[in-house]
Amino acid sequence: MAAKEVKFHSDARERMLRGVDVLANAVKVTLGPKGRNVVIDKSFGAPRITKDGVSVAKEIELEDKFENMGAQMLREVASKTNDLAGDGTTTATVLAQAIVKEGAKAVASGMNPMDLKRGIDLAVDAVVGELKANARKISNNSEIAQVGTISANGDAEIGRYLAEAMEKVGNEGVITVEEAKTAETELEVVEGMQFDRGYLSPYFVTNQDKMRVELEDPYILIHEKKLSNLQSMLPVLEAVVQSGKPLLIIAEDVEGEALATLVVNKLRGGLKIAAVKAPGFGDRRKAMLEDIAILTAGTVISEDLGIKLENVTLNMLGRAKKVAIEKENTTIIDGAGSKAELDGRTAQIRAQIEETTSDYDREKLQERLAKLAGGVAVIRVGGSTEVEVKEKKDRVDDALHATRAAVEEGILPGGGVALLRAVKALDSIKTANDDQRVGVDIVRRAIEAPVRQIAENAGAEGSIIVGKLREKSDFSYGWNAQTGEYGDLYAQGVIDPAKVVRTALQDAASVAGLLVTTEAMIAEKPKKEAAPAMPAGAGMDF
């Protein structure tokens, strides 16, 4: 086992703080409508330009092991916020840095770290309660467009496309973002269905960058039982190979010898193939397989219907324009099913929704209806260069998550103002001791950080902006960094999803609390490089 280096107390916290500052300082320049770009070097291809906080955070790795630990813990804030809300990663990073800095000062002055953390947690709970109480439900499409525009760094075109996509496929519909082949950004709504089952083996992946399987114009075999050997499937497999089309197998499971054979065939290039598990369980699985069969004009291969696998012919297989399979979900786009049959099926599901008395069953039936009737919206992001397209696609992804979050939990005034206004919730907190009160005050100061940073990125003085905002008590009164004007932020369209603001604060406080209560750090000692050996015969006189 390699020797370890151990740091304690203030020494450990100082090193960790340096790492936190490096990462946070690189990320926070991207905050707000006037946020700057960060350029990331790539070992191959053009450098990547981004304003996405989590993309910047993921690229940072420091040489000093202890500093790197601080940076990696802060990176966790951005990643977690990104996973839960899909946006707000830069805000979360700025908040975490502010809480850690204030917390470290308090610990250095002799306060109890555990009481500080309890105070921080009490304050965060109070602020979250205040945010939830003031969140406003989204009432129309233009508000969705405004949320999308703000999250896409003020790009109104992106906001418009997202609002249009959500209007067409509904809030529950599937929206995907792709790179366009042209310079124009466009929206296309495709009939399709998505279910929550991914590929059974990563060897099926065809697009290594995105780790997903993309099958163009495939046949789809829908089988309700397990496949453990392929003997009975050989006739249909041979027919598919001769047709030159890819094949998607949807079955209860594909295991053992059958999966191994499919993987080997895929790797040898003889057969473009992928396999996924059937969605749902029990009777619901049968119904969902039937939905897929109707969507793709295929037949469910089921012994109940007297169809055996060895008797399957090509015309029993479903067809679709495209199938995209990721680690955890599968999307069937543009199935070959007839409109009359699809309409009949959706009418049948609607009738079942009317009849059912169980809330759970109703919810599941509505999910099936959305999948059959909702379709998939595809936003194709265009640009003049590859670098521009990638940067824009990052912003569209952020904006998509933000609009979904806004529909889920409502909206708040943007520009960091909602957090600033929620400070009043801290006045009524009762703490057990003075150290906890200091923990509450740490949060009181830290939640000004996003407003200050947005102002500084826009070339204004953060403390002056915060001072002016404090003069008014109206919850939605704030400073618009885009125009430099004060006023009602709802009216100006400067809004943030409540879920994004809430998640950013909770995740920041969670990781910052861990950093503040850290008393020792352990890392592997850097290896001493051995001196190079002396060349043979060096220094000899021949």
Curated annotation (Swiss-Prot):
ATP binds at residues 30-33, 51, 87-91, 415, 496. It holds the Pfam family Cpn60_TCP1. The keyword Kinase does not apply. NCBIfam families: GroEL, PRK00013.1, PRK12849.1, PRK12850.1, PRK12851.1. It comes from the Bacteria. The lineage of its organism: Bacteria, Pseudomonadati, Pseudomonadota, Alphaproteobacteria, Hyphomicrobiales. InterPro entries: Chaperonin_Cpn60_CS, Cpn60/GroEL, Cpn60/GroEL/TCP-1, GroEL-like_apical_dom_sf, GROEL-like_equatorial_sf, TCP-1-like_intermed_sf. It is an enzyme of class 5 (isomerase). Forms a cylinder of 14 subunits composed of two heptameric rings stacked back-to-back. Interacts with the co-chaperonin GroES. PANTHER family: 60 KDA HEAT SHOCK PROTEIN, MITOCHONDRIAL. It comes from Rhizobium etli (strain ATCC 51251 / DSM 11541 / JCM 21823 / NBRC 15573 / CFN 42). Its EC number is 5.6.1.7. Keywords: ATP-binding, Chaperone, Cytoplasm, Isomerase, Nucleotide-binding. GO terms for biological process: protein refolding. It is found in: Cytoplasm. Gene3D superfamilies: GroEL, GroEL-like equatorial domain, TCP-1-like chaperonin intermediate domain. Together with its co-chaperonin GroES, plays an essential role in assisting protein folding. The GroEL-GroES system forms a nano-cage that allows encapsulation of the non-native substrate proteins and provides a physical environment optimized to promote and accelerate protein folding. It catalyses: ATP + H2O + a folded polypeptide = ADP + phosphate + an unfolded polypeptide. One of its GO terms (cellular component) is cytoplasm. This is Chaperonin GroEL 2. One of its GO terms (molecular function) is isomerase activity. Belongs to the chaperonin (HSP60) family. PROSITE patterns: CHAPERONINS_CPN60.
